[in-house]
Amino acid sequence: MADKEKKKKESILDLSKYIDKTIRVKFQGGREASGILKGFDPLLNLVLDGTMEYMRDPDDQYKLTEDTRQLGLVVCRGTSVVLICPQDGMEAIPNPFVQQQDT
């Protein structure tokens, strides 16, 4: 057999464009936090600075309240991360798949 080349494992997401920017992270179990992304690895372990956790309603665990708590520097385990999004939101673009009709 020929020598097998070792493939470098690549992350499914390229988070390098979010370094030093505020992101929001949702975790398994319903917790949410936002902070400045300082680092990450291919397993999506994240390092967030200035992290704030959004508190949940004690009566309804799926509902967030306006309350927050400061966590500071946090290491987030990649296996518990469900969603990562920029804190500033997203920019809407026109749908490139819709064909424009002449009126």
Swiss-Prot record:
The name this protein goes by in its record: U6 snRNA-associated Sm-like protein LSm7
Organism annotation: Mus musculus (Mouse)
Function description: Plays a role in pre-mRNA splicing as component of the U4/U6-U5 tri-snRNP complex that is involved in spliceosome assembly, and as component of the precatalytic spliceosome (spliceosome B complex). The heptameric LSM2-8 complex binds specifically to the 3'-terminal U-tract of U6 snRNA.
Keyword terms, alphabetized: Acetylation, mRNA processing, mRNA splicing, Nucleus, Ribonucleoprotein, RNA-binding, Spliceosome
GO annotation terms (biological process): mRNA catabolic process; mRNA splicing, via spliceosome; nuclear-transcribed mRNA catabolic process
Domain Sm, first and last residues per copy: 10-90
Subunit structure of this chain's protein: Component of the precatalytic spliceosome (spliceosome B complex). Component of the U4/U6-U5 tri-snRNP complex, a building block of the precatalytic spliceosome (spliceosome B complex). The U4/U6-U5 tri-snRNP complex is composed of the U4, U6 and U5 snRNAs and at least PRPF3, PRPF4, PRPF6, PRPF8, PRPF31, SNRNP200, TXNL4A, SNRNP40, SNRPB, SNRPD1, SNRPD2, SNRPD3, SNRPE, SNRPF, SNRPG, DDX23, CD2BP2, PPIH, SNU13, EFTUD2, SART1 and USP39, plus LSM2, LSM3, LSM4, LSM5, LSM6, LSM7 and LSM8.
GO molecular function, one term: protein heterodimerization activity
Any single GO CC term annotated in Swiss-Prot or TrEMBL for this entry: cytoplasm
Recorded family membership: Belongs to the snRNP Sm proteins family.
